Amino acid sequence: MATTSNGIAVSISNTPQATNDVFTSAQTGLTDNALTTVYLNVMANDLGGAAKTLYSLDSGTEVTVALEQTALLTQDTARAEAVSTDYSAHGAHIWITSDGKVGYDASHLDASWLSNSFNTLGYAQDSFTYAIRLGNGTLSWATAYVDIAPPAPVVALAHDTGSSATDHITSDCTLSVGGIAHGATIQYSTDNGAHWNTSFSAVEGTNTVLVRQIDVAGNASAASSCCFTLDTTAAAAPGVALAVDSGSSAVDHVTNVGTLNVTGVESGATVQYSVDGGAHWSTS
């Protein structure tokens, strides 16, 4: 608690009145793909009743507790982002709002810190400190932690089989998933996000698969989608005949014209030929 002299705070200590907070990505919507401004109610779990007010903010990066407490002794009178000079531990712009919350502008977060956190730790958690003033004028301080979920995965078909490698028509539904945070769990959904699992089963025909990652702290990324058509049904054998059976007989298969008449070919299919019993195939 702070002691006061003539109503001015001169010291502060970490006591139970102000309680540490953890704001998850599920609560704030903050992800590496959505670094927006959110408003954090840090006093929701603090003691002190209705008379308490949010007094000051700081990055929480002071090297000693004494220095941190000193930094929080100065009251923040600004109530707008434009005039606040406070930042979180990793660069988010923070300020006290007119209704007693903390404005948190995540667009200012250090991009290198975010990337390194996901790649090495497997999660990204920012923080800042705050002090509350109780009804009797005393101060109490705590730390607020803010989780940032990892980026949406990079998803593509591992093998786009068939005549085109870019038409998303394939006989192989294996997905290639990249951009995964260290230790994260990959999840898939085939019902537009209603249910998630660590694997999926594609169906014959059109598929839309959502893919997300869950970091080691339990924060879910935004989802990426991959749309493809799965075709594992073998085409029916085509009908084949000589286009021209020349000579004295039109049915003896003795001809001087090697052109074939191929029928019953599936739309979009590629016709291939083999002259060595199927050991090798080509389009002519």
Question: What is the predicted role of each segment?
Answer:
Residues 1-2, 76-150, 192-206, 214-219, ...:
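Acidic, turn/loop-rich segments in luminal/extracellular domains of secretory-pathway
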Residues 27-30, 64-86:
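Surface-exposed intrinsically disordered loops and tails
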Residues 43-60, 176-182, 261-266:
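Acidic, Ser/Thr
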Residues 1-59, 127, 131-152, 233-234:
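Extracellular interdomain linkers/hinges and stalk-like, low-complexity segments
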